[in-house]
Regions:
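Mixed-charge (Asp/Glu-Lys/Arg
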Residues: 1-198
Length: 198
């Protein structure tokens, strides 16, 4: 079985709360969300809680509403999620100009073009982004996401010898025997520049 198939199958087997936690970590990494808030998951667990949206973030001064679904009958769930988010936006009296988009992450790979267009129409006047199991699994095979497949799915094809800079610093600094390298430099930066250029 190929690595991507293993990841897809593992994602489909996740319970709702675990999928939500994976999704939050994935979206945080994919879109560099610094302030993602998980309303739909219980702190410190893989359990879900009631809340609309499941998570939200802010990007360029606009709110991103995020919903997750692990249901086998994905279309009714997506329709319901979109309806609930729109109701919540209306109820909370959030202006349309403050809404960036609605993201729906799901575990299906069977949404046809016509169905996608129907969901986009249903989401109007807001932009809809659908992220399915194929896209998530494909991204989890990329170097910058591989730590997520290991942490949330216990799948690792990497020898863990190559990391992006942020992950390397995080891993390096987490060791009790290493001196941290994430410290800010205090001093005259021109000294460093002159050393490098000389």
């Amino acid at each position: 079985m190929s690595w991507i198939n293993k990841i897809e199958n593992a994602i489909k087997e996740l319970e709702g709360g675990r999928f939500q936690n994976l999704g939050d970590a994935y979206l945080r990494k994919k879109y560099h969300f610094q302030n993602l808030v998980s309303l739909g998951s219980q702190e410190g667990t893989d359990k879900t809680t009631k809340g609309i949206p499941d998570s939200y973030a802010e990007e360029n001064g606009k709110y991103i509403y995020i919903m997750y679904g692990t249901h086998k009958s994905v279309l009714p769930k997506l329709r319901e999620d979109i309806r609930l988010v729109k109701e919540k936006i209306y109820k909370d009296n959030i202006k349309e100009a403050k809404i960036g988009r609605i993201i729906c992450c799901h575990t299906s790979s069977n949404i046809e073009i016509k169905q996608k267009e129907e969901l986009e129409e249903l989401a109007k006047p807001y932009k809809l982004e659908l992220i399915g199991v194929n896209e998530i699994a494909n991204d989890l095979t990329k170097l910058e996401f591989q730590f997520l497949s290991k942490e949330y799915l216990s799948i690792s094809e990497s020898t863990e010898q190559i990391w992006n800079i942020d992950d390397f610093i995080k891993i390096h600094d987490s060791s009790k025997t290493n001196a941290p390298i994430s410290n800010d430099y205090i001093g005259d930066i021109s000294d460093i520049v002159s050393w490098i250029t000389s």
